[in-house]
């Protein structure tokens, strides 16, 4: 059963055409890796599905009650936001907070009160991963999830994704 339907989309930036009459159906258990060189529309496709950009024409439909979590290649690192507030998106749900604390510790970010502005690039990427993974989602949209990660974190992420039961669309330049 398709949970995402992309039908006849077109997207261009000025003269640069990325998609012209593109269509794709995504099943609830699909694991799709999108590999390619810069400027070919990989990140744009995820942005279109996530709803952060609009196609010039065509439709993208996500089935009812499908929860989507999106890890952008460039993420907002609000400078004075504390780590726990960032990864939980300010929720007060105790279950989400407990899960966030576990995942922060597992990914080497135990100081939940630290400001994002004080984190290194790799730590910010790990914080963005925690934010993406803590709440249940049926679909993970992951744009360059291994950028700024060391080999141990990449290995952890690979294991996590191998055990993930939902749909994954992953964009990368690497063939790992």
What are these regions (language model features)?
Residues 1-176:
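ABC ATP-binding cassette signature C-motif
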